[in-house]
Amino acid sequence: MEFSTKALDWSKAGQNGFLATKTDCLVVGVFEGQNLAGVAKALDVATKGLVARLLKQGDFEGKRGTQLTLHEVAGVGAARVLLVGLGKEADFNDKAFAEAVRTAVRALSSTRATSALWCLSQQPPQQRDIGWAVITTISLVRDAGYRLLERHPGLKRANGKPGAADKATLRKVVLAVDANDAKAATQAVVRGTAIANGMELTRDLGNLPSNICTPTYLANTARAIAKRHKLKVEVLGRKQIEALNMGSFLAVTKGSVEPPQFIVLRYDGAGAKQAPVVLVGKGITFDTGGISLKPGEGMDEMKYDMCGAASVLGTLQAVAEMGLKLNVIAVVPTCENMPSGVATKPGDVVTSMSGQTIEILNTDAEGRLILCDALTYVERFKPAAVVDVATLTGACIIALGHINTGLYARSDMLADQLLQAGRKSMDTAWRMPLDDEYQDQLKSNFADMANIGGRPAGSVTAACFLARFTEKYDWAHLDIAGTAWKSGAAKGATGRPVPLLTQFLMDRAA
């Protein structure tokens, strides 16, 4: 899908003005009530009071979530005019803006329109600028148009014919902006497109079946990103992982015939003296639970257990496309967690790269076992900050559901930066406790720590486990178990937390 901007003179609406633009659909936002303003007023004047009459007659009221499509409107060059309800102007916030975009996309999807002049983005909520509006619009429109089957021909249905849901008709969107916002809007198109691309990569990797998206596939994806954007990439195999004494990571890999991979992808957008931000993503490409086997029902969704890895790769790709002036490193430990005659058993004790010993009481608590060695490895980069991303605990879903990502951090400053980025990108997180008292639950009679701490505060104790390996740098942990994918009729990867991470990095680069 192609996005561009067009600077328009709103004072010249009719003949030779923006309303004369030839396009399949003109998209205009209308606030609830009869006091028209902005583009809606210009449209009303050019159409001799059409919008006002519709409001007065009650055919369209401008309420949130509503829309009305008009065809062949006199005085308008577009084949269709789509009126989108914005709700009450006093209540127009980020969520109302997003709802208007989604409403417009749904309405357009029921037509054969392939192009649109989009007059919603120049009307952002208070305290938001044109850049935010453009990035948000592109992300939401692209999100609605995502189709895995079209992006991966090898997954097409046997008859070779896509279903109705696989058809995306909207191909070109021109975002109308004020002339004095043109420069900022153009930059925002680049950034919005990069973020959408990163989200789509993340969703692709998550949605692909685990017989395709293996650890080797993830490594090859990282190599492809590096080649396309001229980045540095290093992929360590089993022998190199063994040489680094990553005993915790290796313990998880023992049951699978798929070779483990340890991926390091570097984006150097600033000088060598700038300490990098490191993103660490959990890459379990399929999680059976190992010897502590999961129930069969719903196990197919454990292909999503690598969404942390997918999100950091998607984020790094987005950063490279945007050309941000900062240094970012993505680190991905990736393997399968499988049962077999040589798999790690409950009660086994292993030595991590840090030298700390771990009693593995439950082989299904494997994400923390691969992450802890990665978190030790990244000390060599002397990072400015480290953020790990993982579908780590079902307990986080119990605590927060599917709305907020769980956020853990020692530093209030780092936590606030991530929370603010989440609010701005509408990819929200909620800060969880990391008190030292929870560490007592990880005590072991046979090792420095156990890999589980019992049922109480399961997401917290998982974060406390990771905290033991992050004392040499500023660190945060994002538990995305509830936000990385959806189940049911809308089943599929969400692309989160790419918007949060990219906004966090854009803010640091500003």
Curated annotation (Swiss-Prot):
Binding sites annotated in the UniProt record for Mn(2+) 2: K282, D287, D305, E366
GO BP, sorted A to Z: proteolysis
Reactions it catalyzes: Release of an N-terminal amino acid, Xaa-|-Yaa-, in which Xaa is preferably Leu, but may be other amino acids including Pro although not Arg or Lys, and Yaa may be Pro. Amino acid amides and methyl esters are also readily hydrolyzed, but rates on arylamides are exceedingly low; Release of an N-terminal amino acid, preferentially leucine, but not glutamic or aspartic acids
Annotated catalytic residues: K294, R368
Cofactor binding mode and count: Binds 2 manganese ions per subunit.
Domain of life: Bacteria
InterPro entries: Leucine_aapep/pepB, Macro_dom-like, Peptidase_M17_C, Peptidase_M17_leu_NH2_pept, Peptidase_M17_N
Keywords recorded for this protein, A-Z: Aminopeptidase, Cytoplasm, Hydrolase, Manganese, Metal-binding, Protease
GO cellular component, as recorded: cytoplasm
UniProt GO MF annotations: manganese ion binding; metalloaminopeptidase activity
Cofactor(s) demanded: Mn(2+)
Main location: cytoplasm
Residue sites binding Mn(2+) 1 per the record: D287, D364, E366
Cell location: Cytoplasm
EC number of this enzyme: 3.4.11.1, 3.4.11.10
Family: Belongs to the peptidase M17 family.
Protein name stated in the entry: Probable cytosol aminopeptidase
Species the sequence originates in: Cupriavidus pinatubonensis (strain JMP 134 / LMG 1197) (Cupriavidus necator (strain JMP 134))
